[in-house]
Swiss-Prot record:
Binds 23S rRNA and is also seen to make contacts with the A and possibly P site tRNAs. GO terms for molecular function: rRNA binding; structural constituent of ribosome; tRNA binding. This is Large ribosomal subunit protein uL16. It comes from Spiroplasma citri. One of its GO terms (biological process) is translation. HAMAP family: Ribosomal_uL16. The keyword rRNA-binding applies.
Amino acid sequence: MLLPKRTKYRRPHRIKYEGKAKGNTKVDFGEFGLKSLDGAWITNRQIEAARIAMTRYMKRWGKVWIRIFPHMAKTKKPLEVRMGSGKGSPEEWVAVVKTGTVMFEVAGVSEETAREALRLAMHKLPVRCKIVKKGEE
């Protein structure tokens, strides 16, 4: 699972995922990428599930780059607790993904293998995505 080693603050303010991404919008490392068409918070479990789906389909050939990282702690209060008395404790770690962010990249495999691996990863994520080729963003 991906999570930060240390953070400056335990319980950060929420970061909005509306709007378009400013950076991380092009395929930089691999040949094919998975680009988000919506904004969302993606948990470290969803990132790991997508990574496993891709690497298992590619049978460990090629290389996978994960371009997002879950920096933000999402807090939750226990069940049946009254309102107030502070913010809840950190429950899970999420990555803030905006529209147009390239989340995963793949290289070293054929085009059909890369497209199928990225398609399998798409089904593990809570955002609509599209597969992009390097230079065709």
